[in-house]
Amino acid sequence: MIDIDRQLEHIKRGCAELIDEGELRKKLERGTPLRIKAGFDPTAPDLHLGHTVLIHKLRHFQELGHTVIFLIGDFTGLIGDPSGRSDTRPPLTREQVLANAETYKQQVFKILDPEKTVVDFNSRWMGEFGAADFIRLASRYTVARMMERDDFEKRYKEGRPIAVHEFLYPLVQGYDSVALKADVELGGTDQKFNLLVGRHLQSQYGQEPQCILTMPLLEGLDGVKKMSKSLGNYVGIDESPADMFGKLMSVSDELMWRYFELISSRSLDEIADLRRKVETGEAHPKLVKESLAYELTTRYHGEDKAAEAQQGFNAVFAGGGVPDDAPVHACDHGDDSTPPAFLEAAGLVKSRGEAKRLIKEGALSVDGVRCDDANSPLASGEYVIKLGKKRFLRLTVR
C-alpha cells in the first residue's frame, strides 16, 4: 500500500469535506483494503460529466488498492431523492429504473477498472424488507433530526408538502452502508445529510461508522448552476465526439480550471503550472482549454475520434468556412446571451419567434455543435455561430 500521507493527499484532491480525517487515517493504518461506496440512483438514462466527479474519486481509491462498490440505487430510485428539491420528485417505474441502471453499468467502466469494481443493487437487501423491517429502521431516527435537513425545513416553513416516503430515502440510503459494511462513502455536497444518516445507522447497528467524503457539484456549461440534463447545461459521456469537444470548448476560461481539477487526470502541479503560464501570457487559454477538451474526448471516445473532433472544431472556430465579413456581436451574459436574443440583436433574424422556430428545426450551431436549447444563456466566452447554411456570426459574451 502507498504511504498513508500520500494516500490522504490523493484522496482529498478536489474534495469539499472529509469527515473525519483522523478516523480515515486510523482505517488506513490497518493496512487492509477499505470498502469504498458511492451510490447512484438511475433516474436518467445517461451519465454526464457531473456524475464523473464521484466516479473519478472512486478511481483514485482503486489506484490506491481499495475495494470500490458502485451501488446502483434501483430501490431508492423508486422513491426519488428529495435532496435540494423544493417539491416532491415523481417516482419512476420499475422498468424505467432497470433500463437506466443497465445503461449506467455500460458507461461507468469508461472510468472505473471493471476488475476492481463491485457493482451492486440495493434492491438485493431492500427488496426483502417487510413492513416490520421498515418500522424498525424508522425507529432508529427522529422526525426532529429529519427536519434539520435544509430542504425539508424550507418546504415545511413555506407550507409546501413533504410526503412521508421522502423521509424514507435517507434512511434507506443510510442502511445501504450498514448492508455493505462501508468504510467510506462518497457523495456530492448536497448528499451530506444522507451520508451522515449512514454514519448514525452504522453506529446503531454496532458497526464502525463510515468516513464521509463530499465532492463539489460540477457547474454546467453556463458556469452558474450544477450540471444537469434537465437544465440543458450538461455534457453527456456518450455524446458524439464533436459535440463533446465543442461543448467543452464553450466553457468560460475561469470554469475550465474547475473542470481540470475535478474531472481531468492532470496532477495538481501540472494544473498549477498551466494556470501560471496562462496568467503570464506564456500559453493562450484557448489552447489550454483545447487540451482539456482533447483529454476528455479521448477518454470517452479514443484518440482518433478526439483528433477528428479537434480538427472539425478548429476548421470552424479558426475561420475555415467562416466569411471574413461575418458580423461581430457582443452581449452580456444573461438574458441577452440566449440564442433568440443575440440572433435578433445581431440582425440574423427579424424576431425572436423566427429564431425559436429555426432553433427547433435544428438550424443553429454553436462552435460547430448543434444547439436545440433556445432558453439557456451562453456562458462568457467567444463563439462562432452558424444559422442555416450561410449565416455566420462571431459572438462575444461578456
UniProtKB/Swiss-Prot annotation:
Amino acids binding ATP: K229
Residue ranges of the motif 'HIGH' region: 42-51
Motif ('KMSKS' region): 226-230
GO CC terms: cytosol
S4 RNA-binding domain span: 341-397
HAMAP family associated with the record: Tyr_tRNA_synth_type2
Protein name: Tyrosine--tRNA ligase
UniProt source species: Nitratidesulfovibrio vulgaris (strain ATCC 29579 / DSM 644 / CCUG 34227 / NCIMB 8303 / VKM B-1760 / Hildenborough) (Desulfovibrio vulgaris)
Lineage, highest ranks first: Bacteria, Pseudomonadati, Thermodesulfobacteriota, Desulfovibrionia, Desulfovibrionales
